[in-house]
Amino acid sequence: MAEKKSQKNTPVKQIDPEQKEKALAAALAQIEKQFGKGSIMKLGDTQALDIEAVSTGSLGLDSALGIGGLPMGRIVEIYGPESSGKTTLTLSVVAQAQKNGKTCAFIDAEHALDPIYARKLGVDTDGLLISQPDNGEQALEICDALVRSGAVDVIIVDSVAALTPKAEIEGDMGDSHMGLQARLMSQALRKLTANIKATNCLVIFINQIRMKIGVMFGNPETTTGGNALKFYASVRLDIRRSGVVKDGDEVIGSETKVKIVKNKVAPPFREVQFDIMYGEGIARMNELLILAESHGFINKAGAWFSYEGEKIGQGKNNAIKWLKEHPEVASKIEQDIRNLLISNPTFTATPDSENADNADDEFSEEEL
């Protein structure tokens, strides 16, 4: 028998730490030269941590989101039942963004935007870009073009359920188009995500709820458009109407509850409640009074409310009226509350985990 050749253990080459640092610096320099500045950086760098936010118009929701609003350069999904306040909340975001000089666009796939109502919510309709596309492909192409331009800061897509594929529109009633919309959304979001981050554009998708058939245990509710949006969204808001606001026997608004079911930029699972008044939108002063009282900025003794020792009104309605008549004081109180509740505006973003999403494997929606 031939003798077995003795195997020599080749020693692992040890790299000098100084040479390692030089090699890493050279590699980073080459990457930045080839792909541009900021293409790679350390997570602890200030640039990577600073997340610009757009206010939602609700002080409570802004604080619950952790960074003072919805994050720029990210995808956000807002979903809920019919007449729960989804469009009202997004129009409120548009109004706040426009106040800060941002350019906004509204892709109205449902063809149902009411400009009169939008103006009542504070939206500058003259400066708002609007598109009413014929099909889902056209809507998402328009969205992609606006994002790539770098000139639009906030884009609303209303809604995912109305993004009907061209093949379905041109087909006959009753034709089966299994998974067509899910594939459309998956392809579009793959293209959009990198461009959205590069141009620091906020894209909000409004979505509807459907019921799963045959679910015996667990939540039978699901959103339309497959699983892709659940994965790509940095923030997902579940908005519901929890009650009504009455003036005597007349219903003048609705009590609204929002649950943050996913948040990649701050801790998730927080809930907040506020009122949406018909023809007015989010009741900002009502919310401000409640938060100011609960955090000690406004004191209440009996039925009287007081601020810095001065009585501002007897009863809630009179106190709200006083705040509306003194916007500079209301603004100061709001800023004090923001400084207290949003103590770290540059909160470290969490990894790309799916938080609350018990979604199926990403490939499942691709195969539909």
From Swiss-Prot:
HAMAP family documented for this protein: RecA
Name of the gene this protein is made from: recA
Keywords, ordered alphabetically: ATP-binding, Cytoplasm, DNA damage, DNA recombination, DNA repair, DNA-binding, Nucleotide-binding, SOS response
GO biological process: DNA recombination; DNA repair; SOS response
Similarity-based family: Belongs to the RecA family.
Residue numbers binding ATP: G80, P81, E82, S83, S84, G85, K86, T87
Biased composition (Polar residues): 344-353
A UniProt-annotated Pfam family: RecA
GO molecular function, one term: single-stranded DNA binding
UniProt cross-references to InterPro entries, sorted A to Z: AAA+_ATPase, DNA_recomb/repair_RecA, DNA_recomb/repair_RecA_CS, P-loop_NTPase, RecA-like_C, RecA-like_N, RecA_ATP-bd, RecA_C_sf
CDD domains, per database record: RecA
GO cellular component, one term: cytosol
Annotated region described as Disordered, given as residue ranges: 344-368
Predominant location category: cytoplasm
Acidic residues bias spans: 354-368
Annotated SMART domains: AAA
Compartments, record wording: Cytoplasm
Function as written in the Swiss-Prot or TrEMBL entry: Can catalyze the hydrolysis of ATP in the presence of single-stranded DNA, the ATP-dependent uptake of single-stranded DNA by duplex DNA, and the ATP-dependent hybridization of homologous single-stranded DNAs. It interacts with LexA causing its activation and leading to its autocatalytic cleavage.
The name this protein goes by in its record: Protein RecA
Keyword Nucleotide-binding carried by entry: yes
